[in-house]
């Protein structure tokens, strides 16, 4: 069967566990062609011989997407419940501090989201919009992120920075602790380090970094508050959104329990982890509607 760029495929050698789209075709040193693959719902990049690929039919694609949407909706509902409880708590706190009750307003933390995948960036921006997180989205190749981040931080002045895209671990290239055995972990680490040179304090700029199978420990050591992937598993395309939404909607006087953040994600503690971090939401008053 002839495959083309844009085709939806799965790999026979992996029991067709992940749905991919073909994003490129390259020639190996031996002269044969291989397909470059991006996960359709997970942030995984891979390459494959065409002989290992099988086309995924439309009905199978729809079935997988419906299952994925169901999981996404569960996570979104958890976020909405958390935010509802937060608003009720803050309403009580804000009005109980003053003799005259005034209307108040919320200022959620601003997010700068750098993504190596333009299609995933669009998906993430749609979810940010649904849940009301203020965000600036930038499509940037993983290898160019480190050189771009200082200018972007000056321009957008975010409270939260997301550094993500695609990644993968290859045991043929080295051991699990060897950063050179990962497709883009090194570039994510360099970007975090550059951002931290500019804004060292962990609570002045909250950073999420990583993608599928990323080198979690190196990202945390570089200065990320949250990162992937402790067990080197795949993470969902929207997992970064669920993490930063929780941070964005948590008041800056409160510390965020790491498990409280991870429970809203699709991958949870096998794919994501982090350190104790302050929220970035601020509350003000009075609020005057037009």
From Swiss-Prot:
Its main location: membrane. GO terms for cellular component: endospore coat; membrane. Its EC number is 3.4.-.-. GO terms for biological process: sporulation resulting in formation of a cellular spore. Disruption phenotype: According to PubMed:10714992, cells have an altered coat protein composition; CotT, YeeK, YxeE, CotF, SafA and SpoIVA proteins are present at increased levels and/or exist as precursors. According to PubMed:16751597, cells show no effects on vegetative growth or spore resistance to heat, chloroform or lysozyme. The germination of YabG mutant spores in L-alanine and in a mixture of L-asparagine, D-glucose, D-fructose and potassium chloride was the same as that of the wild-type spores. The keyword Nucleotide-binding does not apply. Induction: Induced by SigK. One of its GO terms (molecular function) is hydrolase activity. The lineage of its organism: Bacteria, Bacillati, Bacillota, Bacilli, Bacillales. It is an enzyme of class 3 (hydrolase). InterPro entries: Peptidase_U57. Transmembrane segments: none annotated. This is Sporulation-specific protease YabG. Belongs to the peptidase U57 family. It comes from Bacillus subtilis (strain 168). Keywords: Hydrolase, Membrane, Sporulation. It is found in: Forespore outer membrane.
